[in-house]
Amino acid sequence: MPYTAEAFQNEFLALGATEVNAIVTVTSSGAEGGRRTSGATEIIIVDASGSMQAEGRINAARQAAKAAVECIDDGVNFAIIAGVSTAQQLFPAPGQLAVSSPQSRSDAIRSIDRLQASGGTAMGAWLLLAAQLFGQRPGDIAHAILLTDGDNGERAGYLEQVLDSIAGRFTCDCRGVGVNWKVSELRKIAQAMLGTVDIVAQPSGLTAAFEQMMVKAMGKTAADVQLKVWTPVNATVRFVKQVEPEVMDLTGKRIEDGPRAGRYPLGSWGAESRDYHICVDVPAGAAGDEMLAARVSVVEGDTVHAQSLVRAVWTEDTALSTKINRQVAHYTGQAELAEAIQAGIEARKAGDDRTATIKFGRAAQLAHASGNKATEELLATVVDIEDAATGTVRLRRKVEAADEMALDTRSTKTVRVGRAQ
């Protein structure tokens, strides 16, 4: 599976400077012929709690789950979990995985017709059962879809314990239907499991959302790709963040690999490209000094697919050292944009209109300057943007809950910058 890794940076540092920043673009053309390099397992987790009866949500969830099953390729292992106060395996028999075929997909669809809404919400238990099922197929491309419409009902801290114990075993894309679920809860799951989170405001949108997630999952051809970052003596990694297609901090997911290297999980890959912001602290150098600040490799197990170097060169020439690389500047702004939106939402909920206005104003300014039109349009559902260039906004008196939740869930989505300096 061919990969490339390309670093974008201004390697010139002012005298006394110790912080090195680079954007590393990792691109994969996918496996030859689109064939997977390992097996694949898919698990669909559908909230079947009592609240799913409202607004036709359970019926829409049934149709969405059926549509997702129809998208599963022949030969892929799969299972369906009904989520209530416990995790109940709907298909196949408890503790087993089915192998996708026209017959097994037809059987699964009949099982989905039995899905009824009653009981509570226990996301930790649902995820734990999924992890146990995935455990039967080590090395597979492992992906889950989790749908809910409400708050987790488990004791405080239990979901976090489960996430700590299963992180890295599979990726999980989370969707909330309606407006009675917590964005922070699903974001916690998605971040721990290297997945995505989004709102499906109306039940009628579930089928398209499920089909989109499953089709994307079927395009993955490699199971466990990692970014290995080596730094020299006296240099340390400050952070590693995915910054495109959305912001995700990978710093805390580091696994040590030898005395001066660490691996950061990137999840499963197909034919795609993603950008990562690497920040390294190095000892200050004298004018003319040059050093390798980091060696960044794309790896699978012991196989190194691609490599890129991050350099540092100290100079007295301020024209060189003060020039901020376009990619670094752009993605630093996109990360600030996500933080500003989330801070604005929190301030608005707390009744702090002044802080909310300031944060949303800064977000509007950043979205406009970076060409992130999708985020600018989402902001316009929460504030009236009077002048995006200066960040002048007014809070709207009435904001639909679905609009605010859409802004929150999609705040981390970024746009790519052109490659010219």
Pin down the residues of each PLM region.
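Exposed acidic/Ser/Thr-rich ligand/metal-binding surfaces
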Residues: 4-224, 283-285, 369
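Beta-strand elements of well-folded, non-transmembrane domains
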Residues: 9, 26-30, 48, 231-233, ...
